[in-house]
Amino acid sequence: MLTFFFLWISTLLLSSFIVYLLYRRRSAQCPPLPPGPNGWPILGNLPQLGAKPHQTLDALSKQYGPLFRLRLGSVNVVVASSSAVAAQFLRTHDVNFSNRPPNSGAEHVAYNYQDLVFAPYGPRWRMLRKLCSVHLFSLKALDDLRPVRQGEVACLVRNLRRHADTGVLVNLGKALNVCATNALARAMLGRRVFADEDAQLAEADEFKEMVVELMRLAGVFNVGDFVPGLGWLDLQGVVGKMKRLHRRYDAFLDRVIEENQANAKSGDLLSVLIRLKEADAEGEIKLNNTDIKALLLNLFTAGTDTSSSTVEWVLAELIRHPDILQKTQHELDSVIGRDRLVAESDLPNLPYLQAVVKETFRLHPSTPLSLPRMASEECIVNGYKIPKHATLLVNVWSIGRDAAVWNDPLEFRPSRFLPGGEREHVDVKGNDFEVIPFGAGRRICAGLSLGLRMVQFMTATIVHAYDWSLPKGQECQKLDMEEAYGLTLQRAVPLMVQPIPRLSHKAY
């Protein structure tokens, strides 16, 4: 009996030892999770993100490397902070990261994931993207709508001229937002949404405020998204604000659709969407009113504020660097002269202007943190295990300031993108990951081509048509460049400037 007992104990110990060896061997073969900071109980690293998460994450990348991990509540989050790591996620593993994680903004503002930006990757998403690509963003559509953009930019010039004549400072961001919104609205709806009359200035201000509020709320790391058990408490008040903002947008979009149906023009995007809603083609994915409003919401917000805020940053940098402003204006005068305004067809002949825009995208990307993506399956990136359902954030802001890639990364230096410069061949269209303001991969911004044209065109026009001065007492070199974090990168202090005409009278 005693012999049997010792035999049993020996077998148990031997089995345990074998299991331990197998576990050690498997652990040695299994890649580790990315490194990262310790977090708080329950909340994880959420309290550490601060008011400007893109800057916090940039600082953490200096400590933990270009790929690190956070625990936000119960959610694994991996952060890519270099162009090389971003390329592995968005090129090598693009399919695996083509979905979005659950998000309160998508639920409460974007019609419960019915929009293009947050829709699950699949047939419906492809259909929505195709609709936008064919009717708004294809080369043919862009060329057909060129007169629309030129007309709206000409309206912007006239608006600025009124400020110049009266000596009244202009809030440049708002003026640019009206221009971008009307240009997009004429393509989407066949008409403008804001007129030049003073009666509609308040409406334009309200719309700009709604867009900024949406982008701010969309950039908040809502505790309820990461600790579902606390969601009902709405500790930050974010969900309540989202629901109120949604009601305002919904009323605005209802009015837009009703007015379009009363004055329908067959060529605009909304008319096409309404026809698809009424169609009964077998096998086609049909649209309902909610689908249409969700898509319009995407286009009106992402397609307007990103462009206008970028141009605002461009002009702020040029005001701070008079020598670069002078070079830009010299190129514009050489190509266009001073007797007419810039035409969109002039843009390919303005390499220095294009470099100025690229440099602004590098330092002030319109979306500092990429929209989150989610791992559909476990994978290996940069030697680390990325768990299934982990959320991916690409720190676009950090990539543009990476000292391992850029010489003097905090300096505004457009020449780095010119022939002989350190990154002369880098583009911003998702092919080169050093500058990715529009994202990359399958879920790259659908409006990339239009957005790039509008930013270049508005920048070229206002820099060519006007000199710029700051309010009395402000020095160019001391211009406030503080950021206000949100889904888009706003200026903390709006750029208030005085335009000074520099072209011949007949050009205006």
UniProtKB/Swiss-Prot annotation:
Protein's UniProt name: Flavonoid 3'-monooxygenase CYP75B137
EC number: 1.14.14.82
Native source species: Crocosmia x crocosmiiflora (Montbretia)
Function according to Swiss-Prot or TrEMBL: Flavonoid 3'-hydroxylase that catalyzes the 3'-hydroxylation of flavanones, dihydroflavonols and flavonols. Converts narigenin to eriodictyol, dihydrokaempferol to dihydroquercetin and kaempferol to quercetin.
An individual GO BP term: flavonoid biosynthetic process
Tissues expressing the protein: Expressed in young cromes.
Gene name of this polypeptide: CYP75B137
Molecular functions per Gene Ontology: flavonoid 3'-monooxygenase activity; heme binding; iron ion binding
Keywords from the UniProt entry: Flavonoid biosynthesis, Heme, Iron, Membrane, Metal-binding, Monooxygenase, NADP, Oxidoreductase, Transmembrane, Transmembrane helix
Main location: membrane
